[in-house]
Regions:
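Aromatic-lined, polymer-binding surfaces characteristic
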Residues: 91, 144-156
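Hydrophobic alpha-helical membrane-insertion signals
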Residues: 1-9
Length: 176
């Protein structure tokens, strides 16, 4: 065995757990893989929380500039969560608005959006966030700016999304 064996189909997981058998037999799928489900659920939860935050932030006692900044950050986070989903799973359903809790289940069974739709949505949301109140340089404020999304971070995600869009993984309109 060479140093690259772990990255090939010659890998054998020697754990005694159930996942080892599934991996060794090439039969693992999303229903048995908690990591796959965790990412899907947590990123869509982030999208939902961003939408709910944006919907209700106007009721909070904030200044106009704080409100604009926080809405822009929520919009950028939503786009980033979509980018993570698309990068991991390929095209996903793009939800522009949050669904009400009493929405009939047949209306919630959405098909994947196209590759173009996903990336267009991600890039447009990030550009809107840049123009809607993101800070120029959040890291310059060492007390409240650390960890906040600013224009440079949004631009970095735009560049990364467009790079993925142009790559062989997503270049061409296919629905997988």
């Amino acid at each position: 065995p060479g140093p690259w064996t772990g990255a090939s189909d010659e890998t054998e997981w020697t754990s005694s757990g159930n996942k080892a058998k599934l991996i060794n037999n090439n039969s693992i799928d999303a229903t048995e893989n908690t990591m796959v489900l965790y990412r899907w659920k947590s990123w869509y939860s982030g999208i939902h929380e961003s939408a709910v935050f944006t919907k209700y932030v106007d009721q909070a006692p904030l200044t106009a500039s704080e409100r604009a900044q926080w809405k822009a950050e929520a919009k950028a986070l939503r786009a980033i969560y979509y980018f993570y989903l698309v990068r991991t799973y390929g095209p996903v359903p793009v939800l522009e608005d949050d669904y009400a809790l009493d929405t009939p289940s047949n209306e919630l069974q959405l098909s994947r959006s196209t590759v173009d739709r996903c990336f267009d949505f991600i890039v447009s949301e990030l550009k809107e966030a840049q123009n809607a109140g993101l800070l120029e340089d959040a890291s310059s404020d060492k007390t409240t700016g650390v960890g906040r999304i600013d224009k440079a971070i949004a631009q970095a995600f735009i560049i990364e999304a467009l790079t993925y869009r142009a790559s062989w993984l997503f270049n061409g309109e296919c629905n997988y």
